[in-house]
Regions:
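C-terminal motif of bacterial Sec signal peptides marking the signal peptidase cleavage site
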Residues: 12-15
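Post-signal-peptide N-terminal segment of Sec-exported extracytoplasmic proteins
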Residues: 25, 32-75
Length: 171
C-alpha cells in the first residue's frame, strides 16, 4: 500500500514538470515621447471667483432653520455645518469643523470684513470655536445653539465683539 502511494506521488510529480523551454515574455513597448502638438496632461480650468452675493443670499434664505449639533442640512445646522452647506450650494467644498474652516482662505482685518467672509469667535475654548458668514461689515448670519435657529446678529454686539477671533476671505 505504501509502495503504491509512493508510485502515485512520483507519477503526479513528474506529470506536472515542465517538458520544454519556457517561452520568452512578450516584449514591452518602449515609451513614446508626448506629441509636440498635444499637452502631456490637461490643465485644470481656472477657478471662478466666489459669487459673494449668492453666498449671502443662500445664507439669509436659511434663517429660521433649526440648530442641531452635528447638523449640516436645512433640517438642522450647527455653525460649521451651516457654513459648509452654504458654500457647497455655490460649488465650493469647505471642511466640516470650525478649526479646519479657520485654516482656509486669507486672514482679513476686522475693518475689512466683506459680505461672504467667514467670521470666527472663541465661545467654548481658546481659539476659534464658532463661525458665521458676514453679510455686511457689521452683521453676520450663523447657527447659534443659544437661540436654536439660524439668525443674523451684529458683529458689534458686546457678546460677539468680545469673542471675535478673526476673519477669513475665501477666494
Amino acid at each position: 500500500m505504501r509502495r503504491a502511494l509512493l508510485l502515485l506521488l512520483m507519477a503526479l510529480a513528474t506529470g506536472c514538470a515542465s517538458g520544454g523551454a519556457v517561452p520568452a515574455p512578450f516584449p514591452t513597448p518602449s515609451p513614446r515621447p508626448p506629441s509636440p502638438d498635444l499637452p502631456s496632461s490637461p490643465e485644470p480650468p481656472p477657478l471662478s471667483p466666489l459669487d459673494r452675493p449668492a453666498v449671502v443670499g443662500t445664507a439669509l434664505s436659511l434663517q429660521g432653520a433649526p440648530y442641531r449639533n452635528g447638523g449640516s442640512d436645512p433640517s438642522g445646522f450647527d455653525c460649521s455645518g451651516f457654513v459648509a452647506y452654504v458654500f457647497a450650494q455655490q460649488g465650493l467644498y469647505m471642511p466640516r469643523t470650525v478649526s479646519e474652516q479657520y485654516a482656509q482662505g486669507q486672514p482679513v482685518g476686522p475693518d475689512a470684513v466683506a459680505p461672504g467672509d467667514l467670521v470666527f469667535f472663541s465661545t467654548v475654548a481658546p481659539g476659534a470655536s464658532h463661525v458665521g458668514i458676514a453679510i455686511s461689515q457689521d452683521q453676520f448670519v450663523h447657527a447659534p445653539s443659544s437661540s436654536g435657529v439660524v439668525r443674523v446678529e451684529s458683529l458689534a454686539a458686546s457678546y460677539w465683539s468680545s469673542r471675535f477671533v478673526g476673519t477669513r476671505r475665501i477666494p
